[in-house]
A protein has these predicted regions:
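Extreme N-terminal starter segment of soluble prokaryotic enzymes
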Residues: 1-5
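General beta-strand structural signal in soluble alpha/beta enzymes
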Residues: 6, 69, 123, 145, ...
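Active-site metal-binding loops of divalent metal-dependent hydrolases
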Residues: 9-10, 230
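Conserved N-terminal subdomain of the carbohydrate kinase-like
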Residues: 12-17, 21, 39-120
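Histidine-anchored nucleotide/phosphate-binding helix
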Residues: 27-36
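Conserved beta-alpha-beta core of the PfkB/ribokinase-like small-molecule kinase fold
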Residues: 120-184, 201-202
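Conserved phosphate-binding/catalytic region of the ribokinase-like
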Residues: 179-263
Length: 263
């Protein structure tokens, strides 16, 4: 059975207009969504000791994620402040990861052995694991990273040589700009898969240099929080599972689109 790990960020998303907080974070969301698809999933990250940390940890535990290698520190858990504009989530503030930034992950020998037991390790630009990427690359069979809307040249050059799948958010970019960005990412070292999500315009995915496109299934969204994470999760678990069986990606995608899930 496929096994996946979210490595890095966990936060609470504080909806300021409703005074409600929800568990989140790219790495944690990946693990949770995979678990919802019936995949064996774990999460490795840093928790604080405040109410937000307790809420996130308890939720992840209730969902039966493997949390056996997580770290715990005194301090404020990561949080993001959010508002909704016509169903589109807008980030208006954060504490930049809280304890995750103050006490970044340092992978031990036991951690590296742990990573080797997973088919996919997914992390993000918000996880403060850049220094650990060479070790993650050595330990894990398949490494994925969400770069959000980052176009910083130095940062991309630093991280991409260790990544099998890079995800970027391109909702405000033109098609030509996206294609150029995909090629740049490939030139900087991530030559296998690049996922470019475009919100209501669908997604572009480059697999070994071949470009695929998926049109969106348009809905009246009430909240777009986690939409990109769920797309990335669905794509990766279907892609890697198919490749383990040596099936061809174009055949696998078929009428299900590039995520492998029916619209």
């Amino acid at each position: 059975m496929l096994r996946v790990l979210g490595l890095g960020d966990n936060v609470v998303d504080k909806y300021m207009h409703t005074h409600t907080m929800y568990p989140g974070g790219n790495a944690l969301n990946f693990a949770v969504y995979a678990k919802m698809f019936g995949i064996e999933a774990g999460y490795l990250g840093v928790f604080g000791d405040d109410e937000a940390a307790i809420h996130v940890y308890n939720t992840a535990h209730e969902l039966r994620l493997d949390l056996s290698h997580c770290r715990f520190h005194t301090g404020e858990n990561g949080y993001a402040e959010v508002r909704l504009d016509d169903g589109d989530r807008v980030f208006i503030g954060s504490n930049k990861g809280g304890v995750s930034k103050k006490y970044p992950l340092g992978l031990t020998k036991m951690d590296r052995e742990y990573l080797a037991g997973f088919d996919i390790v997914h992390t993000s630009i918000f996880s403060y694991v850049e220094d650990m990427l060479p070790f993650v690359r050595d330990a894990a069979g398949f490494v994925s990273m969400d770069f959000s809307d980052c176009v910083d040249d130095a940062y991309l050059r630093r991280c991409l040589p260790f990544i099998d799948c890079a995800s970027i958010s391109c909702g405000d970019m033109s098609r030509n700009e996206i294609l150029n960005q995909i090629e740049q990412i490939r030139e900087y070292g991530c030559r296998h898969i690049v996922i470019a999500t475009r919100g209501s315009k669908g997604a572009l995915v480059s697999v070994d240099g071949t470009l695929y496109e998926q049109s969106p299934c348009l809905v009246a969204a009430t909240d777009t929080m986690g939409a990109g994470d769920s797309f990335i999760t669905c794509f990766l678990i279907n892609y890697v599972d198919a490749m383990k069986d040596a099936r061809d990606f174009p055949v696998v995608s078929g009428d299900r689109g590039i995520t492998g899930c029916k619209n």
